[in-house]
C-alpha cells in the first residue's frame, strides 16, 4: 500500500498547490480495488506537516486497518461512491471558492464553452438538499447517497464532478491525480461561468454539436486529442 499512500499524499498536497483549499479543508482518496482498501487523508492534519505515512488506510466498511490518525470526516461519502461506481479510482472534496459558490446558490454549473466541454459532458449538477433527518443521521453516508441519487446511472467519468447543495464540490477520476485534475478544472469552469453570466445574463448553453465534438475528441471511442 506504500505506493498508493504516496500517490494519495501527493494528490492531497496538490490541493493547496492549486489553490483549492484553505487551512486543513479538503481531502483526496484512492482505492485499491483488488484488496478492497481505500487510502485517504487524515482528518484535520495540516498540509504543512503532513507526510505520506500519515495517510490512513480503511476497508470498505470504514474500519481503519493502517494509520495512526482518524481518517477524513468525509470518508463515508468516498466509500459510498466507490461502492456504487466501479470506474472510480480517486475522489476529491474541496471548498474551492468558485465551485463552492454554486452550492449555496443551489445551481448547476452551466456548460457554456469548450473548456467545460473538454471535461464535463453537460452541466455539472447540483444535488438536492439533505433533509434534517439525513443530516442528523449518517450525514456523510447520506451525502454520498444524494450524489448517487443525482447522478443515477450516468457514467460518472463523463461528469467527473458534482456540487452538493449548501456544501461544496466533489470530483473524481481514474485515480487520485486524475480526480484532482478534474477538481482544478471544475473550479476554473465555475469561475468562467460566473464571469460569463455576469457579462451576459442571457447567455445560452454551448451548442450541443460543439459540446459533443470537444468531449468526444478527448474521451470518445475515437478520441484523437493528445499523444498515444
Swiss-Prot record:
Which pathway does the database say it acts in?
Cofactor degradation; L-ascorbate degradation; D-xylulose 5-phosphate from L-ascorbate: step 4/4
Enumerate the residues binding substrate.
Answer: 26-27, 43-44, 72-73
HAMAP family documented for this protein: UlaF (MF_01952)
* Record's catalysed reaction(s): L-ribulose 5-phosphate = D-xylulose 5-phosphate
Q: Where is the active site?
A: 118 (proton donor/acceptor), 225 (proton donor/acceptor)
What is the official name of this protein in its record? L-ribulose-5-phosphate 4-epimerase UlaF
Entry keyword set: Carbohydrate metabolism, Isomerase, Metal-binding, Zinc
In its UniProt entry, the species of origin is given as Shigella boydii serotype 18 (strain CDC 3083-94 / BS512)
